[in-house]
Amino acid sequence: MPQNTLNIVILAAGKGTRMYSKMPKVLHEIGGETMLGRVIDTAAALNPQNICVVVGHGKEQVLDTVKRDVVWVEQTEQLGTGHAVKTALPHLAAEGRTLVLYGDVPLIDVETLETLLEAAGNEVGLLTDVPADPSGLGRIIRDSSGSVTAIVEEKDADAAQKAVKEINTGILVLPNAKLEAWLNSLSSNNAQGEYYLTDLIAKAVADGIKIHPVQVRSSHLAAGVNNKLQLAELERIFQTEQAQELLKAGVTLRDPARFDLRGRLKHGQDVVIDVNCIFEGKIELGDNVEIGANCVIKNAKIGANSKIAPFSHLEGCEVGENNQIGPYARLRPQAKLADDVHVGNFVEIKNAAIGKGTKANHLTYIGDAEVGSKTNFGAGTIIANYDGVHKHKTVIGDEVRIGSNCVLVSPVKIGNKVTTGAGSTITRNVEDGKLALARSRQTIIDGWVRPEKNKQ
């Protein structure tokens, strides 16, 4: 097998006690994706022979949540990082290299790992950092010539070693030909009573194998998450980087510090996004799209020149060109709007196709429907699509005028150019061009005396 064969082991067995959560630590999210999912995707971009993920606490929940084509290996006892890698040995090639990553180091990137792999060659590569505060972290020990000789965990370090600022990030590259022997020779005779993966550095030095340290270009790339504060700090760094990339690409963000992207955003030119907007999943924004403040948009496609007014919520929908949506509008999954559609305040559309030029400007629910072009919904229109057991479809033609406060009881068909009187409850099909009225006649009672409060 060629020496450049790459295996990747991702350690994800920890409980994450300091997260104070019933959820396994690696399932907490950065930018709308689990930390472990992010690390696996980064690892996959290196085109390894295989990826082994070592799981332990919450194994079933991890496997159910993180749907990836990897080898899952269970560490039944939490005996340290060295023991965790050892559990993956049966799945690693006899030759080549193994890169060790961590499921709670979510922002590690391909560029950093490629640099480390190149530096390591077929020897040992070690990713290091010099953080502002190295407390609690393993120190990189060098000899008088500057060569790395060992990593000492802080609990096992003496005063001189604790004074060292350079720390071990935990990410390293190891030659497979030596890996099994080194792991089998590990001892748990230390302050933690665990098998430290970091002890392999001293073993490599003893075997005459050179250690190639690479300092990470920015501390956050190798930062681990142990509590919710650290999770929030990395989330903000991640969001800042995404905002910067969008700004460089020509998107106008009214305030980059108040923007969240939890997925992928494809955009045209002259897109404007106001403050406090959240984008989730796969988003596509056409040219000249404007998103008002405080909108939530998830898995949506919005056509050119469309305006989404503040406080609107769009999910799983398609919006055509030149649409006016909101404020306070809600487009639910399978809502498909053609061009020049107006959807106003407190209008909800779900699983409905809306034709070109149609308007629903106020207080309307359109569900499980097919609506033609240039139709107008009066305020308070409701499509009653659910009978308590099944959903039913309503079909409405072109140039229909639905009066205010109407109820269309599905299934029903409304023909082209139909008008329904305000306050009508429509339960039967209406042919083209007809006027449909379904309400009781107004009665005026003369001589009626209105009750008054007794003033005493």
UniProtKB/Swiss-Prot annotation:
In the N-terminal section; belongs to the N-acetylglucosamine-1-phosphate uridyltransferase family. Pathway: Nucleotide-sugar biosynthesis; UDP-N-acetyl-alpha-D-glucosamine biosynthesis; N-acetyl-alpha-D-glucosamine 1-phosphate from alpha-D-glucosamine 6-phosphate (route II): step 2/2; Nucleotide-sugar biosynthesis; UDP-N-acetyl-alpha-D-glucosamine biosynthesis; UDP-N-acetyl-alpha-D-glucosamine from N-acetyl-alpha-D-glucosamine 1-phosphate: step 1/1; Bacterial outer membrane biogenesis; LPS lipid A biosynthesis. Catalyzes the last two sequential reactions in the de novo biosynthetic pathway for UDP-N-acetylglucosamine (UDP-GlcNAc). The C-terminal domain catalyzes the transfer of acetyl group from acetyl coenzyme A to glucosamine-1-phosphate (GlcN-1-P) to produce N-acetylglucosamine-1-phosphate (GlcNAc-1-P), which is converted into UDP-GlcNAc by the transfer of uridine 5-monophosphate (from uridine 5-triphosphate), a reaction catalyzed by the N-terminal domain. Acetyl-CoA binds at residues 379, 385-386, 404, 422, 439. Mg(2+) binds at residues 104, 226. Its main location: cytoplasm. Transmembrane segments: none annotated. This is Bifunctional protein GlmU. CDD domains: GT2_GlmU_N_bac (cd02540), LbH_GlmU_C (cd03353). Binds 1 Mg(2+) ion per subunit. Residues 229-249 are annotated as: Linker. It is found in: Cytoplasm. GO terms for cellular component: cytoplasm; membrane. It holds the Pfam family NTP_transf_3. One of its GO terms (molecular function) is magnesium ion binding.
